[in-house]
């Protein structure tokens, strides 16, 4: 999958993301580059992935997030068959929470 998105434009975009210094800069950047619905949709998918990671059922996830079962299924495929980035991020978030 990574090879399908790897190109100069994506490299520049990712470099731009990595150059942002804090959450406020991320908010400002995404406010400029995306519509509200695009950001909310991405955030919803991330929430679905986290809930799948926690072992929640499709029904519970759908009720809590409003995501369709088709969206949950697509996210589940990414979580289980993807590059492992979700697990890496969830571990980091959980460690950050423990360190508080």
Residue ranges and their predicted role:
Residues 25-44:
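Short, Lys/Arg-enriched anionic-surface-contact patches
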Residues 53-60, 92-96, 100:
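Long, compositionally biased
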Residues 20-21, 27, 100:
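Active-site anion-handling motifs in enzyme catalytic cores
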Residues 42-56:
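Short, amphipathic alpha-helical "recognition" segments used to contact nucleic acids or chromatin
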Residues 14, 69-95:
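C-terminal structural segments of small proteins and small subunits
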Residues 60-65, 72:
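Short alpha-helical "recognition helix" segments of helix-turn-helix
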Residues 1-18:
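General nucleic-acid-binding
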Residues 9-13, 29, 47, 71:
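A general alpha-helix detector
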